[in-house]
């Protein structure tokens, strides 16, 4: 139904508009932004699944919820690895507690070229975290934390980044008092984040991983659980989107 190609000098979009009204479910797997595409598909009568991981784009997509409801359509936002799998892992871990109040996400690796560009951009923006009832902004690339991922990935330094997870996790579980998200990055990644990418991204990233740390109460005791998945992030995102 639709195809999109983007490079440093070329931006090409091709859409077979006649097929828009024939689609029952559309999965948006191209790079951000998705909000205008989602609007077109919803108005054409299709259910929409977005794999966007851009913070501003996902906020704009959430604003389309009322429109989707008016058209009796479903608009699923954040159906990828992060966000996406992170929410599923949070929901799974929540069943292991009597109550939860903290969730901390960390991601290593990228999927395809658009994912790599988003990783680069996320380190240049301002991270957003939920802290005791308030949204806090911190510079991306700050707040180094050594995060252990499932083997064969292992441990990587992770940093605050402008990603969509905190807003979506807070919307899904408003009882959470603290939410943060970090991505792995090298020193070069952080120092060059505000510059154009020095080299074109690979067609597909290598082995990646997603983990989430959840804290809460179990009986009268404070408890913490960590769960993660190691796999190519493109594979994770595809599985989440396909099974949504």
Which residue ranges define each predicted feature?
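Rossmann-fold NAD(P)-binding glycine/threonine-rich loop
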Residues: 52-75
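Short gly/pro/ser/thr-enriched loop/turn and capping motifs at secondary-structure boundaries
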Residues: 54-59, 81-85, 110-113
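NAD(P)H-binding glycine-rich loop region in Rossmannoid oxidoreductase-like domains
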Residues: 5-60
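General beta-strand structural signal in soluble alpha/beta enzymes
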Residues: 50, 75-77, 105, 181
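Short alpha-helices
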Residues: 75-94, 244
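Active-site-lining helix/loop region of Rossmann-like oxidoreductase modules
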Residues: 95-225
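Low-complexity, glycine/alanine/valine/leucine- and proline-rich hydrophobic stretches
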Residues: 226-242
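Catalytic-loop motifs flanking and including active-site residues across diverse enzymes
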Residues: 85-89, 165, 236-241
